[in-house]
Amino acid sequence: MLSVHFWQTPVRPTDAASSLANGIQTPTHRRCQTSNWTGQLSSRTLATIAARAAAPWLQTTSAASFGSPPTSLWLAEAPPQGLKNWAVVATVAVVPTALGPAQARGNLFQATLWPLRDQRGTQDSPSAHHCLILSLKPGQGLRMEGGTSDMNSQTSLTPAEDPVSRPQDSPEPRQQLRPLPEPSASTLPEAKYVETCASAGLRRESPQTLKLPPEQQASRSPKTKAQDEPSGHAPEAPAPGESPASSQCLPSQACENDFSSSSSSSSSLVDSAEDNGLSKMDDPTKLLGVLATSSSSLGFESDPETSCRQHREEAGDRAGAGEDKRGGVDDGIASCKDIIAKSHSKRGPLRNEDAHYITTHEIQLTEVEQGMDFDVGLASRWDFEDNNVIYSFVDYASFGGSDETPGDITTEEDDDNSCYVSTTPSTNTTRTPSPISSDLARPGAGSSGRDTSSTEVGSGPSDSDTVPPPTGPGTATPPEPLLELREAALGASATAASSCGSAASQILLSIKPTSRAINEPSNVRAKQNIIYAAKHEGDMSLRVSSAAEHNSSSLKQNSAAAVAQDHAKKFIAVPARLQTRCGAIRAKELVDYASGASSAVSELDDADKEVRNLTSRAFRSLAYPYFEALNISSRESSTTLSEVGFGRWSTFLDLKCGGVGARVEQSLLRSSAASVAAGLRKGGGTRATADQLYLQTKKSQTKALEFVVSKVEGEIKHVETPLCFQKQVQTGSRVVTLLEPLNLRSESKASSATGPCRITKGSSKGPGSVYTDDGSETSESSKPASRSDGPQKKSKFASSLLKNVISKKMQREHEFKMERGEVTDTSHRNPPSTKETEGPPGAEKPWERGLQRQSSRHSEASSEYTVVSVSDAGGEGSVVGSKSPIFKASTPRESHTGSGQNVSDGHTEVCEIKKSASETVKGIFLRSQNSAFRTWKEKEAEKLEEKAPVGRLKLRKGGDWRADLGEISASKSTIMSRLFVPNIQQTPKDKQPEKQATKYPAAAAQATSVAVIRPKAPEIKIRLGSVQQPSSDFNIAKLLTPKLASGSSSKLFKTIEDNSRTQQKLFRGGDNLEKVPQFQVRDVRDKSKASGPLHQVRDVRKLIKGSGDSSDKGSVTPEQGLTGPKPRQLTPASGGSRSLSPMVIMCQAVANPREEGVDREPREGVSQVSNGGRLLNSSPEGTVLVHRASGRLPVATIAPNKSEQGSYLPVLKIVSKASAQRTPEKPKEEEAKEEGKAPKPARNALEKLTAAVRSMEELYSFNRNEWKRKSDPLPMMADSHVLSLIASEEKEGVAGPEGGDPDKLAKQLGQVEERDTGHKGGVVLRAAPIERLQRRNSNPSTESVSARAAAFENMARERPRSLYIPPVHKDVERTQPLQPLPPLPGNRNVFTVSSSSTQKTGGVAGKFPQGPSPEGLSTAKGIKAQGLRSLKISPATRAPPEDASNRKTAVSLEKSNSDCENYLTIPLKGSAASAELLGRPGASRDGPPSSSAATLCSLPPLSARSQVPSNPKGSQVSGTSRPAWRTKPDNHRETVVAAPTGPQSPEHTPTAVYHQQALPFTLQGAQPQVLCFSPPGMPAPAPAGPAAVPTDPFQQPQPQQTQRKMLLDVTTGQYYLVDTPVQPMTRRLFDPETGQYVDVPMTSQQQPVAPMSLPVPPLALSPGAYGPTYMIYPGFLPTVLPPNALQPTPMAHTPGGSELSVATEPPSKETAAAFTEAPYFMASSQSPASSSSSAPAATPQLVGAKGFAQLHGKPVISITSQPLGPRIIAPPSFDGTTMSFVVEHR
């Protein structure tokens, strides 16, 4: 994501000036909102952007621009004074198809700050114009170039932009620009955009924009907007040849030639006409010039070479414009060449439109204290900007190998892709040299591209960056051309600016590839060496330039120093995504890339892809909270961390991000030696400091993960404090600090930051570094001593600060972590790796207790708690050992393995320091948690004892360690937990749940912390329980099941981690809901332990298990974990595994207070567990899973104890495991269903189903007979949904075939057999009952069974969460009943089945669906909706009438029950397709997903991974229930659970009317985040029954014509469900489930062909909350949705228009109203602002854009199909800190 917070100025300079400070003005001059740009991008502007192929460039005011090279960025004094012109050009280089969609995301963000006063006049003088160009290059990530536009540069630009400037500017630039015009193919889209802009009020822009060539397209949009202001600019645009460059090259150096000239002419024109406008236009133009370079590389029509030329020319212009502009030119040329090389590789395919991917760009602007940040430099404010505002430009897509993740061309490029734009005036000089040395050193480091990418574009006195930028960007990395250009421009700008003032001049948009180590040369001067972070190649170099860096700058003048410095300077403006990515990938990569030394490019490719996918998902949720925190903490950071400065804080985040960088983390884990090597090469091996930096980078990586966790859980405030610590500890400490503050260990942070570890780390870089990562790097021993004191003071300050922030942040983090499986998943992933790491060090366990307790503990202390180190050295060390340091678990494990002794020594040393820090932290931070901490210690000891008695030491070492890790969530989550929760986690792990609960409540801050901790504590407890089979439900379900059933320790660990994460998630949800409930959970746990009902549940479960679960147990690990281990848990639960039992009880009993949060989350956990039992993803759910399993299996038996939980317990069962799910639910359905299932199912599946059905039968009988009657609403619900569907389906005889089919499917999906069997066949049905129970959660009954039945039915009714997706194509009807009952779980399971091989798709499917339900359901209803979110896809092949009837039933159910709204019956196109979808979801998910249109729900928060089985035919998976992302689903998806269902299950791909509940969506706000694109080719006759997704029309319509794919937006990690014609040109989208790139056919033709009901949940369209979650591909959306397809009938069917039949044309006003209520995007002719019920228009737009805007006050982007080039497809969202927009690249 490219997040830029920029001010948008009005058309007139005066307006701009007025609006500058507070408001952001869209390039269209439409004053977004004076105050923050919070989601205030004008809808039109965004729409305009969407219309044009390029992302909008957001211009602040043309008034501001980079001054002459010496001039720093400063706001012009002209009327638009203080206005900056930001052109965000989303010119994404077209990535060759081979590269994959994620690779090419060249987004150019150009901030042109033109001093209105200039030589030529306020804006005229090119030199006076400072251009800040943020370029996102496919391989380079974000590059910010801030440079003055020289007259020459401007001349070139000006000719294109403004005739006035042209004469002034030299013609050469024009020529340079002329190459830019090559992209003129994109001109049309651009023209569209321009037109839009013009219509938006651009006065002369439209003509100009129209002129813009494709390359300019991206810039054009911004430019067009700018053009609004500049009349003079318009003339420029008309010059096609020049216009592109001109447009692209805003005054910023990026497009120096044209840009400058454009700026110049623009300036004059703008000054005369509209200062801002011209400037804006110029800026965009120039930016586009750069982008043209970049743009062509981005895949705009312009050729890569042209763009290269432009790039070079622009670079040359830049060089001319600024001191370094020449260097920039050279750089540009080199860069250009590289870019061309890379661009060609990726651009050609994109040109071919083979590469199609979605990138989400967030432009984040954070305010930084003017003075402090300056010194710090990282977050130094842009001078041109408000002094307080620092614009962090981050390409989340690029972060952490964001590009790599999607399989971008090269990791290097990916590295480039991740760029951190930071304004570090103070780092001015340093910055430039940094890029040089960085680039130089980096190339030496080995990933020259990456290294180059890391070159920071900074303007500084030292910015003789002519050489450095070229060296870094041009030379180092082909993917870095943009970066280099930017660097050249920035360098030139920096050079110019540096003269003017380091602060102002230092607009450092350091765009580093995520692969780059987070550059953590901390601002701390002492820690200049710590630039090691930057050294870490794998890490994104989040360079925080600061005074320290400035100091470093001198050191880094040499290439090595410069590299370190540069890296240090790389700041993470947008750490959130990186963090998430890192978290997701880090654990994963830790596992995957055990040997990757320094996150080599190759290693990082896959890992990065994964990371990007995972972190993208997590990031979506992460980013916004993070940004919020960022905003808060940015100022606080600035003041508090004034020394460090906001940059420092950013660096902190960056460190985290760096840690997040999969590569870095991977390398950390992979090999200490490699890490050292990477650090050396990154730091230019020249300096020991560099090594230390590198070590710190490792640390940074670890911290990054931690930070991700903390960021996710907590807010940036967390980071904020860490920043303080960072300040104190500086880079190394900062890295540790990142983790430490996250750990809420200010002292620990200080100690860690202190560098005891750091020095040791330097010594034992690999392990030590890793260790240090976790525990404040042992290598810091020497440094920290002195540092410790300062950090400790800061620590105290931060401690107090952290207390507040962390308690808050931890709560949030837990919520987020839990809600998005991401954090948990990351933990989960990391644990396997961790376990492996831990395994090798055989002494680790003893070490854990003894040495590790010291060293690991200390390492951990840094990560977890320094206090823990001291206090919990024994307890935690013994329990956690390697796992104790979550990150340590990942890194430290390696460190233990690799340099265990080293770490030992270092840690001993660190121990001392950490002790002092620990003491400080204890005194300060732990003051509130001290008792908890001690109790935790005690509990940990207890835990250890408990674990040992359980005889699960092995698990303890692996599992418990994992559990501990799990308690921390995983390397990432774990750290987060350790961050603050570790104590609590571990305390609860043992018996402290109540104790801790009591103690925590004692302290308010503690309570907050505890709230955060608590969720983890249960995890830990569960983990412990996991160690003991009965000890923890989740652990047993996850840990035990994998261990017992799978017997795979890694899987077991995963399970453990999943469990812990699930628990964490669960608790986090509880945190989110209530801290008390969490306490309650603990208490309940203990009580539950004693409570008979729990045992009963267990016993019942045992019985159930004995009857049918036994087979399940054997059959499926997850099920076994859920079902099999559960009975075991029963026995041991009361005894050794009390905490686990209580945990289960907690879930079940504590469901009351946390019904919403816990139940939902547990449910999510269950779902995740079912899927995640096998998959890491389900780890967070795993916890809930077991709970659910224990609660769910016994649901029928033990309804009373867990009535609330019972409601969701069934969900638990359903989601938790197909088997467990089946066990409780199936018994209900068993009789009816088993009959059908018995014949076909594999014995295991049959047995499982039978057992499940039997259990379910009990529930069902109760539901139908007893339960149903007990809760009046339930009978109807049960009948209408699960029961009714089951009965009707069974009656129809579908039950038999379907039952058989599900079993068959289960068989087919061997891995999902158990889960899927229940899932596909009975589980889906069971899920409904369980969901009913879940629904019951909202109104838990005294009697569990009746309550469960009632809740289940109620929930089913309330939340038709499960779209009716006939798991089996054959048994549509039966599936419908099934799905209605457990639609969500079932569907999830189906998804699991369908993506079970993919698996984390399955896991996500199972898990996220649950996650969303727990997370998002404010009520059981929400949970149900989420649970039911699975779409029921009835096979179209099946008798359409039957399907229609089924659908009708579903619809009627929906109708009857508003909650049912979520049920979306989606007839699958064909029985075969359905069978495929259902039968081979896993397979199809893995391999077929692309062929079968893997329909991952595009639920960023919800795990899009869980998707309905893709229909090989494509588009049969019309809807996928989109589980909430583990990242953000829980929190944001309370209601989304239901809503996502709707969008997730586009009815059949043909017309795929989503009857997504309008209500659920409305309720959930922007929850539903699945964007289903019906292939336009499927003009699918309006569904015959538009009301209920017309089964027949959708089923029968051309299933083969379209394929629905869940495509991952690697940039944002969002998933888009795209129905695409199979034949049309395909776009390559990354299918995270298969990890493959799917070519999604996208053609303009398609759009009109098949009207796609696109009820896009507001969430999808509410960028503020989720950012643009959904992106509607114009190609996907028919230009006009057929009225029948989009009839509002579904809405009528669904109560309250719950099912929005997204009929663009036919939707009546009420439909429109419904859409508005439930913000769905419909393809409609109306402009985004127009009412949702706009008449169908030729251009598909987001219907309900207006509604969306109304609901969320967020602009909706109207997306018009454009042939090629990037275009904004999702409404740009602005949360006040960041603006994010989804850019589609074709």
Curated annotation (Swiss-Prot):
Pfam families documented for this protein: DUF4585 (PF15232)
Q: Does the keyword Phosphoprotein apply?
A: yes
* Post-translational modification Phosphoserine, affected residues: 1179
Specify residue ranges for compositional bias: Low complexity. Answer: 232-247, 422-438, 1105-1115
Entry-annotated residues carrying Omega-N-methylarginine: 1767
InterPro entries, A to Z: CEFIP (IPR052303), DUF4585 (IPR027838)
Where is composition skewed (Polar residues) in this entry?
149-158, 248-259, 1131-1140, 1167-1180, 1336-1345, 1389-1401, 1504-1521
Q: Which residues carry this modification: Phosphothreonine?
A: 721
Q: Does the keyword Magnesium apply?
A: no
Q: Where is the composition biased (Basic and acidic residues)?
A: 306-329, 810-828, 845-861, 1153-1164, 1223-1238, 1301-1319
Q: What keywords are annotated for this sequence in UniProt?
A: Methylation, Phosphoprotein
Q: Which spans does this entry mark as compositional bias, Pro residues? A: 467-480
> Region labeled Disordered — which residues?
140-191, 203-329, 400-480, 746-907, 1081-1180, 1218-1242, 1291-1348, 1362-1460, 1477-1550
UniProt protein name:
Uncharacterized protein C4orf54 homolog
What is the organism field in this record? Answer: Mus musculus (Mouse)
